[in-house]
Amino acid sequence: MANERPTSQQRPAGGPRKRRPFQRRKVCRFCAEKNLTIDYKEPRTLRYFITERGKIVPRRISGNCSAHQREITEAIKRARNLALLPIASNHTLP
């Protein structure tokens, strides 16, 4: 079939299959430290969750749990609406 995995005979010459390096599971910093809060009025906290292009960092990269990722997304969108965070990449943070 077309969707089968390649066997060792079908793999190109070059040795055995390479393994991915082990990465430790990221822990949600808001679950780990209960005193941290997510607030749209704190752009310095939210800055860690947006890229230099102004996009929201996904959960698999930031390590947040799904509940806190939703809160961060809402807070970033509110801060953008109030011009506390940049919408595009050519704006600078205060």
Swiss-Prot record:
Residues 1-11 have a biased composition (Polar residues). Signal peptide: none annotated. Residues 1-24 are annotated as: Disordered. Keywords: Ribonucleoprotein, Ribosomal protein, RNA-binding, rRNA-binding. The keyword rRNA-binding applies. It comes from the Bacteria. GO terms for molecular function: small ribosomal subunit rRNA binding; structural constituent of ribosome. One of its GO terms (cellular component) is cytosolic small ribosomal subunit. GO terms for biological process: translation. Pfam families: Ribosomal_S18. Part of the 30S ribosomal subunit. Forms a tight heterodimer with protein bS6. Binds as a heterodimer with protein bS6 to the central domain of the 16S rRNA, where it helps stabilize the platform of the 30S subunit. PANTHER family: 30S RIBOSOMAL PROTEIN S18, SMALL RIBOSOMAL SUBUNIT PROTEIN BS18M. Belongs to the bacterial ribosomal protein bS18 family. This is Small ribosomal subunit protein bS18. It comes from Pelobacter propionicus (strain DSM 2379 / NBRC 103807 / OttBd1). The gene is rpsR.
